[in-house]
Amino acid sequence: IMPSLVGSEMCIRDRRYGVPGPIVVAIWGRESAFGSASIPHDAFEVLATKAYLARRKDMFRAELIAALQIVQDGDLSVRDMKSSWAGALGQPQFMPTKFRALAVDFDGDGRRDIWNSVPDTLASIAHYLQQSGWVAGRDWGFEANVPDAVSCTLEGPDQGRPIRDFISAGVTRVSGRPFPPHEASATGHLMMPAGRMGPAFIATPNFYVIKQYNNSDLYALFIGHVADRMQGGGAFRGGWVKVDGVSRGDVARMQQRLQAMGRDVGGADGLPGFKTRRSIGAFEAENGLRVDCWPTAELKKHLN
């Protein structure tokens, strides 16, 4: 991936946008395998079809209009407007409205070419994160040891607190290193993507900025972890416990039961997001069960 080119340009981008180069490169790698992935579809065919047939017709109609405006602006020809099956454009996989708002002509050739230009691609990703609220100088998060005394029900982006409060409660970094002083005095969030059945993290607001690129805890973890590995970090220390006997339909039914009790699970979609996880934990605590904050076969019995 042309390490000397990428490395020098990342230094420039770090200064201009305040987003660490490894985070940008990790997103580039995840979205298009560093520009090597095939992006074969005609963007106009994809977007027009979805504007007519998809569930979110209004959204795709707006994206189709934005795609037409991209050609009108002179960034690309109609023939070269290639997208994914979902209408996402180029190496960073921007939807057309995001392209118009956030794509950057970093190489100075007069076009924002996120299909063929590595400088434009990387700068556009950095600009996207900057405009989404990236806090310069802060990390994305830290894998942590979270003692049982710190409840998994404290998870979520709406329950942030100074990281020093977590430290006082016994939370430590799995690396054995202390939290940097500037991080300890700033806001952090408990993040346990599999409840007590997987690794735990103290996430910073930048973790949730990554989620604005793709609204998935596991996506943001992937990006942060790959960026750390680029800088010499090791594998996650916490293991992921395999949970048998629970299907997505089972999770949806559990969510429905919890909703009927007046708990906010974030929607009964069968996906255990943070609201579902902490609602499960609260139910477990109130009913004398082991507090795992995760949909298990044992919990399924109690909610039937």
Task: Go through the PLM ranges and name each one.
Residues 78, 85-90, 95-212, 220, ...:
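Flexible, glycine-rich surface segments
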Residues 44-71, 105-110:
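Acidic, His- and aromatic-enriched active-site or binding-groove loops in soluble protein domains
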Residues 204-217, 225-270:
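Acidic, Ser/Thr/Pro/Gly-enriched interdomain connector segments
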Residues 246-251, 259-303:
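Short acidic, glycine/serine/threonine-rich helix-capping segments at coil-helix boundaries
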Residues 1-7, 12:
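Single conserved hydrophobic/aromatic residue that forms the stacking wall/gate
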Residues 15, 20-26, 78-83, 109-113, ...:
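Surface-exposed patches in mature extracellular/periplasmic domains of secreted proteins
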